Design a protein with these regions (language model features):
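A short helix->loop->beta-strand "cap" motif at the edges of active sites that frequently abuts
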Residues: 30, 90-92, 118
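Short, intrinsically disordered, charge-balanced linker/junction segments flanking boundaries
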Residues: 2, 73, 156, 187-193
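Conserved core segment of the aminotransferase class I/II
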Residues: 114, 118-189
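Short beta->alpha connector loops at strand-helix junctions that form conserved
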Residues: 15, 34-39
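Hydrophobic/aromatic ligand-binding patch that stacks against planar heteroaromatic rings
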Residues: 23-24, 86, 112
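Phosphate-binding glycine-rich loop
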Residues: 1-10
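Active-site phosphate-binding strand-loop segment of PLP-dependent enzymes
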Residues: 37-107
Length: 193
């Protein structure tokens, strides 16, 4: 939600997508533009669809929210490089919601930031892969080029909440620094079932 308030532009979303993206954008006074997807492209827009949508929008301060692995479909975006090329061409900002990165059916994951590092903001957290829903431990990884955007988010955040409680912070350190190969293997096995 803070990202939407800090961003003064319009949002491109693919359908289907997480149910709260649109309401959060509306609260942040961001107009939403939808791209309808299909099973043929794994429930993600094609590069052609993204380019067509960008061209159809008059305002050019845009952000595309990419959620891969996707909620609700669980699929992984397979055309990241092509989407990144379009994004670069139009200087499109991408918010890559990677909250499900460690919970994939195929156990393989790439981030669009690999192909478009200067224009991609990555968001992630513990709630999904670590079973820590409600802890509200998350992060934004922002490229240096977008440091002013990060400052806006930090300013808003400091007025919205002060910090995550100490026990949760210690648990987060263990979650991110510990070796969880066995846990992830068991989780992947459950997903395959």
């Amino acid at each position: 939600l803070l990202m939407h308030v800090a961003f003064n532009g319009e949002i491109i979303l693919s359908a289907p997508s997480w149910v709260s993206y649109e309401p959060q954008a509306i609260i942040g006074r961001n107009k939403v533009h939808w791209i309808q997807t299909s099973r043929e492209n794994n429930w993600f827009p094609s590069a052609k669809q993204l380019e067509k949508k960008i061209k159809s929008i008059k305002k050019k301060n845009l952000i595309f929210i990419l959620n891969s692995p996707n909620n609700p479909s669980g699929t992984v975006c397979k055309n990241l490089k092509e989407l990144a090329l379009v994004a670069k061409k139009y200087n499109l900002l991408i918010l890559s919601d990677e909250i499900y990165t460690d919970l994939t059916f195929c156990n393989k994951y790439d981030s669009i930031s690999k192909f478009y590092p200067d224009g991609t903001i990555i968001s992630g957290g513990l709630s999904k892969w670590c079973g820590a829903g409600g802890w509200r431990v998350g992060f934004f990884a922002v490229p240096d080029k977008l440091s002013s955007f990060l400052e806006s988010i930090k300013t808003l955040a400091s007025e919205s909440y002060s910090t995550v409680n100490s026990p949760t912070q210690y648990a987060a350190v263990e979650a991110y620094e510990g070796d969880h190969a066995e846990y992830k293997a068991k989780t992947t096995n459950i997903l395959r079932s």
